[in-house]
A protein has these predicted regions:
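Residues forming the flavin
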Residues: 1-525
Length: 525
């Protein structure tokens, strides 16, 4: 196939640490067939470098590109947009992850790393020659509604920003909170199901005994952290233990708890879905300082396995220490314990002093935040993945910090994992802006890298229907499997599991992958 290929080598990704022979890679690329342009850039994500790359691509009439850099998810999206303006669609821009697959693991063996990099370059060139432009279609959005699930700090920030951008917002809150909302607030309401895709979602919501459908274009998950029933050996031994936010509420009401007060950073050292993050650390420090100010004679202890004072929280740590708050650090193998026979005494081994300390307390406080129990149900309804900690998984911490892998679904605040108020508010603002920008387009784009069915081979075994997490395959009018392009996310699970080999993933067909593999392994099979 006649084509003009541009090869871009990102020195930022492939030469730090200095390992690969960049001139050798450039020579191989320039001598390969169909390669008309080779560019070595300091950083492909840099605006000035990107302009030079695209300028040369236009001059050489490039219609395909190979970028030797880092993981595709970490490459600045502006790279693909710039290539699209130059007439090179995103599916014809092949990103080779030399940093994670070659440079970092091969640091101790430079020669093998160089050989692997050269092999991957040749394989990418062979693969790109086989690629074809893929068509995309558009569909009009039925509504411009943005649904925010959760009316906490992050949810309210998202709603305010989205509303200022002209979007119609609907906040869904499971409690009976009476809040000022820029749009509609649906309290005592939960999301129990959902269908559709980014731009045209339909959520099944329940308010009391009433169940109804709600159409929306985008969804922001802002469920917050979970304050579930405290579990674990400490909570079982001390029935009167309270979570940190309850102590905070008491202080706000002017109630000073009975001392001494012990704040422990985990309710269950052996439990799951418990994450102690900057929120808990910051709140622990500030609350401990407030306790000492309210009653200087009260002994306050902070017992922790790990603590980090982010940013200005360092001042809170310094203030708490100067006020007389005592800090005790323990090691994970030796967590704090409470003897059921003495439920008002906590025993812990101070790792700094290498001695066991017994602390008699009047109030025991747990600082950690379990994942919200609603996350799993909401993630299942929206067909989005979850993190091991029980939060919603985002696309990329570097490029998509408040986006999920699914278009039109955003996430912020402690729905990801526990956050401080400031961070939750900032993420809510970002999610609101992105959601508003998404619905402002008024139409959705779909197609490109999606699954395709050869119906002559289809045996209608329904394996793909049961496997697809997005419900894209369905039985069409001809009695064979078809793929709903708007739902397909191009994950390739159906293509990989189809026993009849009736499904292929466009841009990753058997011929394309076979050519790449044969070139990479240096054989004809």
């Amino acid at each position: 196939m006649k084509c003009n290929i541009q090869v871009v080598i990102c020195e930022c990704c492939v030469s730090k640490p200095a390992l690969l022979d960049i001139p050798a890679l450039r020579k191989i690329a320039s001598e390969a067939g169909n390669v008309t342009s080779v560019v070595v850039a300091d950083a492909v994500c840099d605006g000035e470098n990107l302009s030079d790359i695209i300028k040369e691509a236009k001059e050489k009439e490039v219609d395909r590109a190979i970028v030797l850099a880092c993981h595709k998810r970490d490459v600045d999206p502006s790279l693909f947009k710039a290539y699209a303006r130059a007439g090179v669609p995103a599916n014809l821009v092949e990103v080779v992850n030399l940093r994670e697959e070659v440079v970092l693991p091969g640091a101790a063996e430079p020669e093998r790393a160089q050989a692997k990099a050269e092999a991957k370059l040749n394989a990418a060139i062979a693969r790109v020659r086989m690629l074809e432009p893929l068509e995309k279609d558009t569909e009009e959005m039925r509504t411009r509604n943005i649904v925010i699930i959760g009316a906490g700090v992050a949810g309210r920030a998202a709603a305010e920003v989205a509303a200022r951008s002209g979007a119609h917002t609907i906040m869904i809150e499971k409690t009976g909170k009476s809040l000022k909302s820029p749009g509609i607030l649906m309290s005592h309401t939960t999301v129990i199901g959902g269908k559709g895709y980014g731009g045209n979602f339909t959520l099944r919501i329940k308010a009391g005994e009433k169940v109804e459908d709600l159409d929306c274009a985008a969804v922001i998950v802002a469920t917050g952290g979970g304050w579930a029933t405290l579990k674990g050996p400490l909570a079982k031994a001390c029935k009167d233990a309270i979570p940190l936010f309850k102590l905070h509420e008491k202080l706000e009401s002017g109630i000073v708890p009975t001392g001494p007060v012990v704040i422990v950073d985990t309710p269950d050292p052996s439990g799951k879905n418990v994450k102690v993050q900057d929120f808990a650390w910051e709140e622990s420090l500030e609350t401990a300082a407030r306790l000492k100010k309210a009653n200087p004679d009260t002994d306050v202890w902070v017992v922790f396995q790990e603590m980090r004072a982010f940013g200005l929280s360092e001042l809170a740590y310094k203030e708490a220490a100067e006020l007389g708050v005592r800090f005790v650090r323990y090691d994970k193998p030796a967590p704090p314990k409470i003897d059921p026979k003495e439920p008002a005494k906590l025993t812990v081994k101070d790792s700094a002093q290498a001695e066991v300390i017994s602390i008699k307390f009047g109030t025991l406080v747990f600082a950690s935040i379990p994942a919200n129990a609603d996350n799993e149900r909401i993630a299942d309804a929206l067909r989005i993945p979850m993190s091991p900690e029980g939060g919603v998984r985002r696309g990329s911490i570097q490029r998509w910090p408040v986006s999920t892998p699914r278009p039109g679904v955003f996430v912020c605040g402690s729905a990801l994992f526990p956050k401080s108020r400031a961070v939750a508010e900032a993420e809510g603002t970002a999610a609101g802006e992105l959601a508003a920008e998404f619905v402002k387009k008024g139409e959705i784009e779909f197609g490109g890298i999606i699954a395709k069915v050869e119906q002559e081979k289809c045996s209608v075994c329904l394996t793909c229907v049961r496997t697809c997490p997005y419900e894209a395959p369905f039985i069409g009018e001809a009695g064979k499997i078809e793929i709903k392009a708007q739902l397909c996310q191009g994950c390739g699970m159906c293509a990989g599991i189809c026993p009849s080999k009736a499904i292929e993933l466009l841009n990753y067909t058997d011929d394309q992958l076979g050519t790449e593999a044969r070139t990479l392994l240096g054989g004809d099979f």
